[in-house]
Amino acid sequence: AAGKQARGRLAWLDISLPQRGVDGLAATIPAVFTLLTNKELTLPSFSVTSALPSLMNGGKDFSEWSKKDDLLYKTMRIPVEAILGRDGVGLADCAIAESRFEKGENISGRMLSLIPKVNEIRQRGTPDMEFAVGGLLARSQLASGQSEDARHTMVSLRAQFAERGLTRFLPNMDAMLCRMDLLNGELDSADAWYHEKAPRDPMHINVMKRYQYLTQAMVELADGRPDAARLTLAPLEAYVKNCARYIDSVHLHVLTAIALYRQKDDAWRGRLTQALETAAAYRFIRTISVYGTAVLPLLEELERVGSAKWHKQLMSEVRTQAAYYPNFLQPRLALSDTLTPMELQILHLVCADKSNAEIAEIMNIKLSTVKTHVSHILTKLDVKRRSEAKTAARKLRLVPEHL
């Protein structure tokens, strides 16, 4: 009996620990189910989502299972829901809907049958599953161009969770709302989240906050700071590789590719190719298409990856998202108007109310050179006077507020 309990506990660790992959789980779960059915084992509860708005990319990455989602739904639904208890209420239906969503399917019909189960999830299940369903609904609404409906879905869910004291979910809900701001080009609102709630500590990475780190990198890209975005993403590299986080790796590689592209670093090609190869292996579409207008120019320059059918579907969905959200991750200052390092230094001095002569002395350049740079800066910022340049620079986050 003690041996069975020990084996059962080890199996539970395989099922519950987020750093353990899903290889072998299809065999482990029925074995644990048998022990539970025979009342030879009891298991503690655990979060299947890690407080994230996703089942497929929550406590574990279930990309491998997505390849056989129909078969696994039929054969694993009963044992999975039995093993997980409260955590399993609504899980199977939500999981297959999300799997199909990632593959580019219109899941509005599936959501119509899933949403009525929310009351059951609320009564018999867990808030983790409730957030997963709400998050999937919001994502499907965004994919259909219904950004106002998506915001209402998440704002309403957040208010309910706050009222019930479910505070551990709020940081990821706020990050999701920030992504909606970015989709709609509401950069001031996104910046408010960034300064008040983003982790912003690359020296002390917490992988449980990975959804927030990815959101943080998106804000940095929108603020025209690809270098900052790369610094935010870099600490996640080892985690997504060592823990087989395929979906997270696609997001990380796409965002890194966008940052490199904007830095005119040709290494973006390798990063985007990695993302495409992973997505194509699982037939995922929306994992990449969600980046719409931000990733479209890169895809147009890159040779095709994956089958012709998959690539055609991907490009169609990317263009659809680009049409719905034309300002997503677009920097405040157009790429063609990006300031050179020298111009940025001179802009800081202009905003500090230094004269051209003082700037020439500080930078050790000729006065005529300063005047030329200042003229270029005014043109790029679309202003005529130095005082206007100061206001524009602050609005574009090119200089600190105290200057």
Where are these regions (language model features)?
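Helix-turn-helix DNA-binding segment
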Residues: 326-375, 379-381, 388-403
